[in-house]
């Protein structure tokens, strides 16, 4: 995903309070709501870790969170 596209999607998810799933280039993943948007990073309230900053440059996959269906 290009940077401009990612910023638009992030802004949409932030504004609409959509729960997101983020995979990072360093192998971590996060599920939660975006609390804050800054110039180079966001703060997500991860379901397990609580408030966590994530650099935009470290985001590999950004998508709407979906519950597992068994």
What feature does the model see in each segment?
Residues 1-29, 39, 45-70:
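Short glycine-rich, low-complexity segments
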Residues 30-34:
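Structural detector for short beta-strands of small beta-barrel domains
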């Amino acid at each position: 995903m290009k940077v401009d596209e990612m910023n638009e999607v992030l802004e949409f998810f932030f504004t609409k309070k959509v729960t997101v799933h983020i995979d990072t280039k360093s192998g971590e993943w996060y599920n939660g709501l975006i609390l804050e948007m800054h110039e180079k990073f966001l703060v997500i309230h991860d379901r397990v870790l609580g408030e966590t900053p994530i650099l935009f440059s470290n985001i590999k996959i950004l998508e709407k969170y979906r519950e597992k269906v068994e």
